[in-house]
Amino acid sequence: MSDFDETAKTLNFDAPNSYIGRSVTRPGARRLAQGRGQFVDDIVLPRMVHVAYVRSPHAHAKIVDIETKKAAAMPGVVRVVTGAEIALVVKPYVGVLTHLAGMRSPPQYPLAVDVARWQGEPVAAVVAQSRAEAEDAVEAVAVEYQELPAALDAERALDPGEPKIHKEFDSNLCFTRTVDTGGVDAAMKSAHLVVEDTIRFGRHTGVTMEARAILADYNRADESMTVYHCGQSPHMVQGIVASRLSLDEHRVRIVVRDVGGSFGIKIHTYGDEIAACALSLMLGRPVKFAADR
């Protein structure tokens, strides 16, 4: 008899508080079905502005020049900010996961500085009175790129001749992990049939009902920041915002109300979200960013 069978003997699956085999009622379902959810994009604060980002169309490119005058003169535009400007108020961070020991990442900023290293990386931010005005002005920002060789295949990216995406490192290796449960060779030899195959799949992500969103409100009077966020890790966000913007952690308040789905994508903190916080710090007013599809 297995350990599971022994354990199962001690469990009462018919206990009144057991969820096994029962339909579980969602306490908040009625409120959400009535349209009474409280999501980040529902929040409107006095003097609030919106940010949209100019993103690199290239997987790897040098940023030669960014012309912002035309965009800055468009209706509703409050400010256009480049990576070099935002780097003055944000400490660089490394994009690693602490539970993956040895993961490598060079210091980086919320907006690309000098070089864009992935397609879609923000290179400039446009802040305007409305989201529509910000998105319209994004189209007026002229960025001159010098396209660089890119590593486009995950398998070939480790070849010595492949372009190095981060000049700080000698290869494109992010991290390594070895999983060894023991007895693998013996199991393969004794198996009736061994099937080997290479399975390829395309890019995928979690597509949530509510896209990523953040509303940062910096109060210059008491040097505090309130961040309305739809993520799953408010304490982590508090620490990151405080450390990157040189704020006392107890002066950073994270408010998470309803989270419109995640599938894992809202566990992390993203550069465009930190950029929104930095812009609120720079402007002294609430700044909202809501991602689109």
Give the location of each predicted region.
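Flexible, low-hydrophobicity surface segments
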Residues: 1-171, 194-197, 289
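Solvent-exposed alpha-helices and their adjacent loops that cap or buttress functional pockets
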Residues: 25, 43-47, 108-110, 115-120, ...
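Residues that form or immediately flank small-molecule/cofactor binding pockets and catalytic motifs
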Residues: 38, 85, 199-200, 232, ...
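Alpha-helical support elements that line or immediately flank enzyme active sites
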Residues: 53-88, 124-145, 214-257, 262-283
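Helix-loop-helix junctions that connect adjacent transmembrane helices in secondary transporters/permeases
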Residues: 96, 162-245
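Short, Lys/Arg-enriched charge-dense amphipathic segments
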Residues: 102-115, 169-183, 273-282
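Cysteine-centered functional microenvironments
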Residues: 120, 255, 293
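Structured beta-strand/loop patches that form or line metal/cofactor-binding pockets in enzymes
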Residues: 287-293
